[in-house]
A protein has these predicted regions:
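Solvent-exposed loop segments that connect transmembrane elements
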Residues: 1-3, 48-84, 124-165, 205-210, ...
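Structural signature of Gram-negative outer-membrane beta-barrels, strongest in the C-terminal barrel
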Residues: 10-12, 22-25, 29, 33-35, ...
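Hydrophobic pocket-lining residues within nucleotide cofactor-binding pockets
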Residues: 196, 298, 393
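Residues on the lipid-exposed face of transmembrane beta-strands in outer-membrane beta-barrel proteins
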Residues: 15-21, 98-104, 176-180, 224-230, ...
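Conserved C-terminal beta-signal and adjacent last beta-strands/turns
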Residues: 220-224, 288, 321-440
Length: 440
């Protein structure tokens, strides 16, 4: 198993100033955003082993500390210090933007909303671009290894120091939405948005992008559909296309069947085509139902990575056209609630997540699952509110998320892992929580 320890301090300041004015059928806004964000962050990583049982126990193993000049074997519970993607960055980013919007009622039935935003972006950050390895840390030091032929201990000097990276860029965004009411209750709507940005300070916490990898991220969105409204139903159905270019991600690649892992920096694209239908239903006084259904197909584009392990073995992963891991293709939300009185409310929440892939190459997956919640909220008076929440009241069991160390496993190899224990995240168990809020 792997554990990351994070330490960070964030300071930020945000202010918005806006002017608005109506001119005939136009509702105009003109504004300025100023946002300052300072980050001082670092993390470290380690690995450990535990028994597989109801109450797992930490296990001891034999390991060699690469910082030990004698390379003596030690009996330890943790090992592989900072082998896997420890992070560090310190610096700030500042965004100063001018934006405008216009809500234009062209005719009583036809509405056009459009706007734009231009942002000056400045970033100053410390970056450590050196590849990570066991015993990695800031400073001047040696690591030690043993020559396989002679048995001699070899000292390798390292000098790990952060370097300052400063960027000054312009980002932009634009949006256009058109709505046409065919009747008082039924209408059509379509909108498009494009937004851009450059890599942010947090993306320099790992090895960070090189100058060649520092590219503009572009996010276009196009959607269209229809809506229907009356006094008890608000129904919307939309088809959406969205993509994102030049994503930056650190991926930990583990050699299958071993504990050895390497971290690589990836730059790739994602695109999604989906259909979403949502409804807000109020059939009688006090009762409300929110319902949503989504079918989507998020896929990787230009996703290729390769890694060389300590024994010289080279392995690669090609996720082009694969479904994005951890993202289900089918989503369902059902949220009924009932106000017994104006101060007493009962509610339930059902979330269905369809089949979800647990690794990059669609080799391992989790079956669909329901996550359920329910509760009661009581506003006793203007000073006191009480609540009770039940989590997972259907007592669903299983795993979700990803499976550590599985990224290089292919569909052809997946059968080799049938019946094996693999680590991941578990569904939150049946839980009852009570809360109280006091206002003065």
């Amino acid at each position: 198993n792997r554990t990351w320890l994070h330490v960070g301090k964030v300071k930020n300041f945000l202010v918005t100033s806006e002017l608005s004015k109506r001119f005939g059928t136009h509702d105009l806004r003109l504004g300025v955003n100023e946002w300052y964000y300072h980050l001082d962050y670092h993390s470290s990583s380690l690995q450990w082993m535990a028994s597989v049982q109801e109450y797992p126990q930490l296990l001891h193993s034999t390991a060699v500390d690469p910082l030990d000049p004698t390379l003596s074997s030690q009996r330890v519970q943790t090992y592989g210090y900072n082998e896997l993607s420890p992070e560090y960055t310190k610096g700030y980013e500042n965004k100063l933007a001018l934006y405008f919007t216009d809500n234009w009622q062209v005719t009583p039935r036809f509405n056009v909303y459009y706007g734009g935003r231009l942002e000056y972006y400045r970033m100053s950050a410390d970056q450590i671009s050196a590849s990570r390895f066991p015993g990695f840390h800031i400073g001047d030091f040696n690591t030690y290894s043993k020559d396989e032929e002679t048995g001699n201990i070899i000292a390798t000097p390292h000098s790990i120091q952060p370097a300052k990276v400063v960027k000054n860029k312009l980002n932009y965004a634009a949006t256009l939405r058109m709505t046409y009411n065919m009747t008082k209750q039924f209408g059509l709507t379509a909108d498009g948005t494009v937004a851009t940005r450059f890599p942010r300070i947090n993306e320099y916490a790992g090895t960070g992008p090189t100058e060649e990898q520092y590219k503009r991220v572009t996010i276009p969105l196009i959607r269209g559909g229809l809506f229907y409204k009356n006094n008890w139903l608000n129904l919307t159905s939309m088809v959406t296309y969205i993509s994102k270019s030049n994503n930056i991600d650190q991926q930990n690649l583990t050699k299958p069947g071993t504990k050895e892992g390497k971290t690589v920096l990836l730059i790739y694209n994602i695109q999604t085509l989906g259909w979403t239908t949502s409804a807000e239903i109020d059939p009688f006084k006090g009762f409300h139902l929110h319902a949503l259904f989504t079918y989507q197909k998020p896929v990787y584009k230009n996703y290729n990575a390769s890694v060389t392990f300590d024994d010289g073995a080279q392995m690669s992963v090609n996720a082009n056209g694969m479904i994005v891991k951890e993202i289900p293709q089918v989503l369902v939300e059902l949220d009924p609630s009932y106000n017994i009185t104006k101060d007493l409310r009962l509610w339930l929440s059902f979330r269905y997540f369809g089949k979800t892939y647990a690794n990059l190459q669609e080799a391992l997956y989790f079956n669909g699952r329901w996550e359920t919640f329910g509760g009661i909220n009581w506003n006793v008076n203007k000073h006191l509110s009480l609540g009770a929440t039940v989590i997972n009241f259907l007592n669903q069991k299983g795993a979700s998320g990803t499976i550590n160390g599985s990224e290089l496993i292919t569909k052809e190899e997946a059968g080799n892992y049938a019946g094996r224990y693999m680590s991941g995240n578990y569904l939150r168990p049946f839980t009852v929580e009570f809360s109280a809020g006091i206002k003065f």
